[in-house]
Design a protein with these regions (language model features):
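Terminal, low-structured helical/coil segments at or just beyond the last alpha-helical repeat
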Residues: 24-27, 181, 185, 189-199, ...
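Alpha-helical segment of the N-proximal tetratricopeptide repeat
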Residues: 31-62, 79, 200-211, 346-349, ...
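Helix-start (N-cap) detector for alpha-helical repeat units in TPR-like alpha-solenoids
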Residues: 33, 67-68, 101-102, 135-136, ...
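Structural signature of tandem alpha-helical TPR/SEL1-like repeats
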Residues: 46-58, 79-92, 113-126, 147-160, ...
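Structural marker of alpha-solenoid helical repeat scaffolds
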Residues: 62, 96, 130, 164, ...
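Canonical tetratricopeptide repeat
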Residues: 72, 106, 140, 174, ...
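TPR/TPR-like (Sel1-like) alpha-helical repeat modules
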Residues: 162-165, 173-181, 193-194, 283-300, ...
Length: 660
C-alpha cells in the first residue's frame, strides 16, 4: 500500500468534529484550545505544515492529555516525511488513548514501511478492533501477517475484514492472493517430501492443462502414471486432455483404463457418455448420462461444465471447432428426447456454443442435492459409498463422521468427497484433522492445494461481482495473462489498473519485470524506479534494477542494488549468484568466490559451477577450477539429455493430441 493510500484513512478522522471525539479525559476543551485546533486543521488542509505544527503544539501545551492532537501532529510530520518525529507523536497518542484507531493504524503502517512487521502487528490489531469498518486497516494487518510468514492468520484476518466490509475489492484480491500462496506452499511441501510423487506430477499437469499447454500436461500425467500406475484419477485426467483436443479413440482407451481401476467412477461414466455423443451415438450417450444423473445430478453437471459449484473451476473446456459443429448438428435429435439426460445434453451443447452459459441446473438438481441428509452414517456404509463413488452421501455424513477418530485413509477420502461436491472449506478442516505426520503426506497436500485454488477462484469471482471494471479486476486479469505468458496482454491490464489507481503497489514492478524479459531496459528501469519511489524496500524491483546494470556490465551500479536486496532478504533467489558475477567483473575474486559458493547448491544446469571455476582460474587455483569445471560439465550433460528427452516427449504428445 502506498503512502497516499494509507493517509487517506486519516482524512476521515481529521474531518471529524471535536464533539465527536473523546477529547480531554478530564474536561471539555477550552475555547482557546478549540481555536488552535481549528486553526491547525485549516493550515493542514492548506498544506501550511509549519503553521499546523505550531497550532497543534499550542493545543498540546494547553491540553497535554488530548491524544488526538498528538496523532494529528504526527500526521503533519508524516506528510513532511519526518517519520521518526511522526512515530514519537503516534506512540504518545496511543499511550494516552489505546483505542485511538488512527494513531494505532499509522504506527502500524510506519513500522511496516520500516520492515518491522512484527512490531506493526499489535498496533494494526488495535486499529481493526477500534474501527472494523475501515478496509485499509485490515489490509495492512493482513500484509503484516504475510511478511511474518503467517499466511493462515492472514486469511483469517481478511475473512474477518470482509465480514465488516463485504464489498472491499482490496480485501477480496488479497484473500485470493493468500489462498494462492497457501496452495503454492502445499505444492512446495510435496516437492520437499517427495519430488517424484505422482501427486506433484498430477498438480503440475492440472496447472498446465488449464493454462493452455495440453502437451506438457500429458507429460506430467505420464510421469504420474509411471510413479503410481494403479492410482485412480490419473487415467481420467489424461482422457480429458485428449478429449478436449479431439483424440476420441485415445480418450476412450484412457476412460476404459480408469474404469478398470475404479468401476464406479462417475467422472469416467460422464466422460464416456461425452465420447459417445461426440461420435454421434445419441442413444448410448443418453443411456450413460441417465445413469450418471440418477447417481449424482449436480456432480454430473459440474463435470461437463454445465454448472458450477460457485468456484469458477468446472472441468469444462472448449472442444475443437469440428467437434462443436458436430454437437450442434445433434441438437434436433436430442430435443426429441425427454428426461434429465437429454436436458443435460442440450445444456452441454449450449455451453460449448457459449462458454459463459453455465446454468444453475440442467437436470433439476438443487444445490442441496449434493449434501442432503442421510441416515445412518455408519463407518461401513461410508466405505461402501466411497467405493461406489456416491460422494454426495459421504459429504452429507462428513460432519458426524469427522467427530470420531478415523483411519488416515478414510479421513483423506472424506476430504476428497467434500472437495468433489463443492465444499473446499470443510475439506480443509477434514485434512487439518490428520495427525502431524499424515497431514504432510503428498496426498493430503495435493487435496489442500486443490482446495486453496478453488477458494482463490471464489474470492476473485466475488471481486468481479462487486466491480468487474475495478483496478483490482484488471490486476487479476493481468495476473492471469502473465501466468499464461501472454505478457503484452498482462501489461495492458496492469496499465488499466494503474490508470484507475496510480499508487497501486507492485504493479509498476510487474510491468517492469515483463518489459525486462524482452530487454526493454529503459522502459523497465522507469517502472522499477516508480515502484521504488513508493516502496524503497521492494526486493523484486531492486533485484531486477540491479540485473539491468549487470547486463550492461555496470557491475558497481548493479552491486548497489543487489546489496540492498541481500540486506532486506539474504535468501532472495539468485542474489548470491548475481553478486558473485558482479564481483567477478570487478576482479574482486575473493568476494566472488564467497557468493558463488553460497549459490552453488542451487545450481541446476552447471552455470554457477562454471562461473566459480572461472573465478578459481583467475585466482590461480587450478585444482579447484578443474573440480568446478567437472561439476559444471556433469550438470550440463544431464540438463542437455533431459531437455532433449522433454522435447521428444512433447513432440509425441502433440502428435497424439492431433489424432482424431
Amino acid at each position: 500500500m502506498s503512502v497516499p493510500f494509507a493517509i487517506s484513512f486519516l482524512l476521515l478522522i481529521l474531518t471529524m468534529p471535536i464533539g465527536g471525539q473523546e477529547s480531554n479525559p478530564d474536561s471539555s476543551l477550552s475555547p482557546v484550545v478549540e481555536a488552535s485546533w481549528a486553526a491547525a486543521q485549516r493550515a493542514q488542509q492548506q498544506k501550511d505544515y509549519a503553521t499546523a505544527e505550531q497550532e497543534y503544539r499550542k493545543v498540546i501545551s494547553l491540553s497535554p492529555g488530548f491524544a488526538e492532537a498528538y496523532m494529528n501532529l504526527g500526521l503533519v510530520y508524516e506528510l513532511q516525511s519526518r517519520r521518526q518525529d511522526a512515530l514519537a507523536m503516534f506512540e504518545k497518542a496511543v499511550r494516552l488513548k489505546p483505542g485511538l484507531a488512527g494513531a494505532q493504524f499509522l504506527l502500524g503502517v510506519d513500522y511496516c514501511k520500516l520492515g518491522d512487521a512484527k512490531r506493526a502487528t499489535p498496533h494494526l490489531e488495535a486499529a481493526v478492533r477500534a474501527r472494523p469498518d475501515l478496509p485499509d486497516a485490515w489490509t495492512w494487518l493482513a500484509s503484516a501477517y504475510q511478511v511474518t510468514g503467517r499466511t493462515s492468520r492472514k486469511v483469517d484476518t481478511l475473512q474477518a475484514g470482509l465480514g465488516a466490509n463485504p464489498h472491499s475489492i482490496d480485501l477480496l484480491y488479497l484473500l485470493g492472493q493468500a489462498y494462492q500462496q497457501l496452495g503454492k506452499d502445499a505444492v512446495d511441501r510435496i516437492q520437499q517430501k517427495d519430488s517424484e510423487s505422482s501427486f506433484l506430477a498430477q498438480l503440475l499437469a492440472e496447472n498446465y492443462a488449464v493454462s493452455g499447454y495440453p502437451s506438457v500436461a500429458m507429460l506430467h500425467l505420464e510421469d504420474a502414471l509411471k510413479a503410481s500406475p494403479a492410482r485412480a484419477g490419473l487415467h481420467i485426467e489424461m482422457a480429458e486432455v485428449l478429449l478436449h483436443a479431439g483424440n476420441l479413440k485415445r480418450a476412450e482407451d484412457e476412460i476404459a483404463a480408469e474404469l478398470r481401476l475404479a468401476p464406479h467412477s462417475l467422472r469416467a461414466l460422464v466422460r464416456l457418455g461425452e465420447v459417445k455423443l461426440l461420435r454421434g451415438d445419441v442413444p448410448a450417450a443418453l443411456a450413460d448420462w441417465s445413469q450418471a444423473v440418477a447417481l449424482d445430478p449436480a456432480r454430473s453437471e459440474a463435470i461437463l461444465g454445465v454448472r458450477e459449484f460457485g468456484f469458477g473451476d468446472t472441468s469444462q473446456e472448449k472442444l475443437t471447432e469440428n467437434l462443436r459443429a458436430q454437437l450442434t448438428g445433434l441438437r434436433s435429435q436430442i430435443e426429441s428426447q425427454a428426461g434429465p439426460a437429454s436436458r443435460l445434453a442440450l445444456a452441454f451443447i449450449s455451453t460449448q456454443e457459449d462458454a459463459t452459459r453455465a446454468v444453475a441446473s440442467a437436470t433439476g438438481a438443487g444445490d442441496s442435492d449434493s449434501v442432503k441428509s442421510v441416515s445412518p452414517c455408519a463407518l461401513r456404509q461410508i466405505r461402501t459409498w466411497l467405493a461406489t463413488d456416491l460422494l454426495q452421501l459421504v459429504a452429507a455424513c462428513s460432519a458426524q463422521m469427522l467427530k470420531q477418530p478415523l483411519a488416515a485413509d478414510l479421513r483423506l477420502e472424506i476430504a476428497r468427497a467434500l472437495y468433489e461436491t463443492g465444499l473446499p472449506e470443510p475439506a480443509l478442516a477434514a485434512l487439518d484433522g490428520l495427525a502431524p505426520a499424515q497431514v504432510d503426506s503428498p496426498q493430503a497436500q495435493y487435496w489442500k492445494a486443490r482446495c486453496y485454488k478453488r477458494l482463490a477462484l471464489a474470492a476473485y469471482l466475488r471481486l468481479f461481482e462487486v466491480d468487474p471494471d475495478s483496478y483490482r479486476a484488471h490486476q487479476v486479469l493481468g495476473d492471469m495473462d502473465e501466468a499464461r505468458e501472454e505478457d503484452s496482454k498482462a501489461v495492458e491490464e496492469y496499465e488499466k489498473a494503474l490508470v484507475k489507481r496510480p499508487t497501486l503497489p507492485n504493479l509498476h514492478y510487474q510491468i517492469g519485470h515483463l518489459e525486462w524479459k524482452t530487454y526493454k531496459t529503459p522502459e523497465a528501469r522507469e517502472q522499477f524506479q516508480a515502484e521504488l519511489a513508493m516502496n524503497p524496500r521492494h526486493t523484486g524491483a531492486l533485484f531486477d534494477l540491479g540485473s539491468t546494470y549487470l547486463q550492461e556490465r555496470q557491475a558497481d551500479k548493479a552491486l548497489e542494488y543487489l546489496k540492498r536486496v541481500y540486506d532486506l532478504d539474504p535468501k532472495y533467489p539468485d542474489v548470491h549468484q548475481f553478486m558473485g558475477i558482479a564481483y567477478t567483473r570487478l576482479n574482486r575474486y575473493a568476494e566472488a568466490e564467497k557468493e558463488l559458493k553460497i549459490a552453488a547448491p542451487s545450481d541446476k544446469d552447471g552455470t554457477i559451477h562454471y562461473q566459480l571455476a572461472r573465478v578459481y582460474l583467475a585466482m590461480g587455483k587450478s585444482a579447484e577450477a578443474q573440480r568446478e569445471f567437472a561439476l559444471s560439465n556433469q550438470l550440463r550433460v544431464v540438463t542437455h539429455r533431459n531437455n532433449e528427452e522433454r522435447v521428444q516427449r512433447i513432440a509425441a504428445a502433440e502428435a497424439a493430441l492431433k489424432q482424431p
